[in-house]
Amino acid sequence: MAAAGSLERSFVELSGAERERPRHFREFTVCDIGTASAAFGTVKYSESAGGFYYVESGKLFSITRNRFIHWKTSGDTLELVEESLDLNLLNNAVRLKFQNYNILPGGVHVSETQNHVIILILTNQTVHRLILPHPSRMYRSELVTESQMQSIFTDIGKVDFRDPCNSQLIPSVPGLSPGSTTSAAWLSSDGEALFALPSASGGIFVLKLPPYDVPGIASVVELKQSSVMQRLLTGWMPTAIRGDHGPSDRALSLAVHCVEHDAFIFALCQDHKLRMWSYKDQMCLMVADMLEYVPVNKDLRLTAGTGHKLRLAYSPSMGLYLGIYMHAPKRGQFCVFQLVSTENNRYSLDHISSLFTSQETLVDFALTSTDIWALWHDAENQTIVKYINFEHNVAGQWNPVFMQPLPEEEIVIRDDQDPREMYLRSLFTPGHFINAALCKALQIFCRGTERNLDLSWNELKKEITLAVENELQGSVTEYEFSQDEFRTLQQEFWCKFYACVLQYQEALSHPLALHLNPVTNMVCLLKKGYLSFLVPSSLVDHLYLLPDEHLLTEDETTISDDADVARDVLCLIKCLRMIGESVTMDMAVLMETSCYNLQSPEKAAEHILEDLITIDVENVMEDICSKLQEIRNPVHAIGLLIREMDYETEVEMEKGFDPAQPLNVRMNLSQLYGSSTAGYIVCRGVYKIASTRFLICRDLLILQQLLTRLGDAVILGAGQLFQAQQDLLHRTAPLLLSYYLIKWASQCLATDVPVDTLESNLQHLSVLELTDSGALMANKLVSSPQTIMELFFQEVARKQIISHLFSQPKAPLSQTGLNWPEMITAVTGYLLQLLWPSNPGCLFLECLMGNCQYVQLQDYIQLLHPWCQVNVGSCRFMLGRCYLVTGEVQKALECFCQAASEVGKEEFLDRLIRSEDGEIVSTPKLQYYDKVLRLLDVVGLPELVIQLATSAITEAGDDWKSQATLRTCIFKHHLDLGHNSQAYEALTQIPDSSRQLDCLRQLVVVLCERSQLQDLVEFPYVNLHNEVVGIIESRARAVDLMTHNYYELLYAFHIYRHNYRKAGTVMFEYGMRLGREVRTLRGLEKQGNCYLAAINCLRLIRPEYAWIVQPASGAVSDRPGASPKRNHDGECTAAPTNRQIEILELEDLEKEYSLARIRLTLARHDPSVIAIAGSSSAKEMSALLVQAGLFDTAISLCQTFTLPLTPVFEGLAFKCIKLQFGGEAAQGEAWSWLATNQLSSVITTKESSATDEAWRLLSTYLERYKVQNNLYHHCVINKLLSHGVPLPNWLINSYKKVDAAELLRLYLNYDLLEEAVDLVSEYVDAVLGKGHQYFGIEFPLSATAPMVWLPYSSIDQLLQALGENSANSHNIILSQKILDKLEDYQQKVDKATRDLLYRRDL
């Protein structure tokens, strides 16, 4: 059908009705501007409508591209709407109510200037001028990037409707025709607003408003013949002068054509004559009798014209055309003329064509320089639209427009169907009913109950359901009735509501006018309740829908260059039409049901054929067989028809705009047909094509079944029969199913998607790296009544199609004009190509997935899967995503696995596995598995991740990197699930040592955090023992000691493996760190336990092996992550190059344990020292213990570590001093530390004080801990004397007994001369035998006893000290006392010496 381009095809009506909330009109009242004639106030006019197109609406880069205004008038109300096919206009609908005035039919005229859009309005008493901004002046930039913009009506509220400059009463001048409804208005070249009205005498009244920005007053002029000569020249004389009884010459229809500084006013009058006036010259330039062009005009000449209409069309190249409709009873005639000008300002009409029609009531017609479009409304309330090319159509054959029929009057409901569900499905099926009809029916059905009718599609459905159910229940009088009775009652009320809606739908579908844009050739039908668009039919649809009489006269050469082929196709179409007309409703439902239930269409067709043959009472099948015999080559004809309907293509459409195009061009093109209206129209066009083609394919299947039945009759040979059965039949069925699927998609509503669901979906798609695929919506909620096809067109397909259309323009884009029939045909064709199931791309499915339409996607794939083997893997993948969302995870996994087999064969899957940098790192299947695993991970399905990764391992084969990745993945998710054994097993199978070590580290950390230490310890760690020890050690040294128990874990690890020495080493290191880093009581407690555990470990080893290596300083200070050590200048200190190894034996550990216990004792007694006790040495601890009064503990510590007890005694002596001179507070505090030291006996007398107890404790220690040189006595006395404390007698006596000479020296050191004198005296007496036992002298001086001695040096020092102050008499006495004692001593010594010598001599 290559020659089909020259065919004048039929058009199809596509409703552009709003399905969402009713259009929101902003209402304004135009108040009464003065007193006018009361006679006009009662005039009622019929509803009318009209439209205006912008001059540059067809330019590709114009701000007014695809933009137009349409309006409707009804009584005193004018509704104005601005539409755009590219953008959603805001505030684009206004309703003006004219107080006390009615708007004339056709009394709205719109003009545009460079800066303004000016609306001129005529009512029965006034004229008005509305001045609005031009779209080109509303935006600073020509490049509009938003998807919506403000309408020119946005600021109409600022207009002063009573401004006398723009509103004027029509003066009550004589001769103004009171009953006339025609009018005209225009803008002069000077900006004046001119309004033309017919006069009763046949002239024209013109009311002029000065330019809006120039002061002035309104004026009125009447155009009439001013001289008899002019009347004779023009052949016109007013009726009153003629005096005959012929028809009046009052104008029935006015039209204006502006030329430079003049305006021609054309008036088609009741006397069937056309008059042309010059406004500038105020004279009639031409009169033409239209009856001259009417074949039978005798009756018309005597009667006044009533339904004549006049239209103008101007072409810069061809001039001005006039279209005249001459109305006559039961017939009508169109005459087309061209205005011809001659010299001397004389004009004539050149008759171009006369076209006849049998339709009676012409509602409106539109004229272009080539075509006439006509709108009729017949007696059966049917709307009829036709068009004709008046230049080339010699036969006068009108081309039909297939109007959108009203929904079925009755809905057939089977017994197994719910009436409410079926009626709601019909009421809310996209394209069936408009929102306004549903709202009006709801209002009536509720008997005027106040209801909020500003409802969304879903809200309206709920309200209707509630209203009908309430009405039903209100009518029930009986409490009990059968289910059948209830069903009958339910069906009755739903049928009643449905009939009400149907009635309003019919009323709102009443046609009012045609709106034709000659720039773009777009034709719209303005109806009472909505707007519809007329689009051309495809060749196949045109032939199938064409009435029989048109099909018979169809030019065969336009179908094919081969006349025989063309005749065969026409005969085939005729046969299909005959089958289609014979198919009953039940048969049609059978085929639809078979497609929906995934049953064989061929079998359904065979069943329908059998039913057709069975019920064929009018011998239709015989007629079809007879008609088939006229087809010379049925196989070729059927193949030609199938090819024409098949949109399968091997080449995928380009994605995105050509980057070589400038940004402003790409941005501008990206908005073409971007409005919701355009999207709806395009998708309705696709639905119309799919519906028609579905019927064609259905009838074709039935016909092929018939051909099969006929067998090798005269029609087909055996070879052809086989071909028809095997080839054509199997090609037709997928075609039918494809169109069924597209038809289903065009009626399947998209669902609302919450923002959080969209965000979650976006996260999943970002994991798959599909967020830039173009199949995603721009973060907005899906409109409730939007179909999934509209969603796809708006979000994805539109940009693809537009970029494809303008990728290789035939002319520069700036010069490209938009032709609506061509564009809508191309756009619907490419959209069908993108939707075609067997084409390689699957953008439609991807769009549904990207926009969270999961239920619809599942249904679509279910309808597609059994018969379409294209994109199988992509479908399985997307179905898997749907199952993920619905929670059917095993089904999802199964789908993902099935899709893997198609990787590398399908475009979507190839794009899915393509990495961002384009680098192929593994096989395609492994890349696919990686993406799916990441998706499952993000969704949070570890079980599925494990299963899929396990399956993918087989695919990995010898690829050790992929093996490592997959096994790591398995390990990770087993670990997350708490499958510790499986996680360890997976860990051991990772071939990459680096990954294995990372996983091992993770295993250790996670099991520690979960406190699942038994598993961690008991795993065998074959070939991983050192690694796990190293990991635990590094973790132990890197983390906080009190919140993590890695040391204890490592201890258990070694104990479990009987490695006691390492276990002891671990616990010893743990204890060391606790002391240094954990300055708490709990830390000290743990430190003791650690050392005790280390001791136990060494005791389990044979003595010769019971040792450990002192943990190096690096175990504590050089840990990973520790900050570098610096000197006082801030520079890093160099690490020591060599370290000495220190061996610790059991004894050393016992000492450390003892020290740890002592630390704990001290900490419990005095918490303030906790911070320093933990890391203190034994010597430091001794001082701390003494300071705290824990003298028993201090002595024990000193003995353990072989430390001198001197600090202990000094400390106790000091405390005694403090108590000696302290107050009550000191006494009270002393009891606490005294209680911690065990005294030899308890003194229970009340007289005993803390001071006494302290001295007694000191005395006890001195008696208990004796040393060879009496060091402790010395240090205690020294301490006391240094603080000026008198020595207690017991201490003096105690020290005298052990070292009186040292006591003397101490007295001398502290200048205690009198005490020294007393001591010397007593000492000399003791030596001489008087009280010798108090000085520890066993044998006093005698000849038989051992030798005795006196500390002469100290005595000499004493005498010297006493003699230094000779003025002190007391000193002299003391000195003399000593000298006397010494003299006495010397005498006795001398005597004893002699006795000794005597004895020796014997």
From Swiss-Prot:
Assigned keywords, A-Z: mRNA transport, Nuclear pore complex, Nucleus, Phosphoprotein, Protein transport, Translocation, Transport
Residues found modified as Phosphoserine: 10, 456, 915, 1123
InterPro entries documented for this protein: Nucleoporin_Nup160, NUP160_helical, TPR_NUP160_C, TPR_NUP160_M
GO molecular function: structural constituent of nuclear pore
Localisation per UniProt entry: Nucleus, Nuclear pore complex
GO CC annotation terms, alphabetical: nuclear envelope; nuclear pore; nuclear pore outer ring
Gene: Nup160
Protein name: Nuclear pore complex protein Nup160
Subunit structure: Part of the nuclear pore complex (NPC). Forms part of the NUP160 subcomplex in the nuclear pore which is composed of NUP160, NUP133, NUP107 and NUP96. This complex plays a role in RNA export and in tethering NUP98 and NUP153 to the nucleus.
UniProt key word Transmembrane: no
The protein's role, per its UniProt record: Functions as a component of the nuclear pore complex (NPC). Involved in poly(A)+ RNA transport.
Broad class of where this protein is predominantly found: nucleus
Keyword Protein transport among record annotations: yes
Organism: Mus musculus (Mouse)
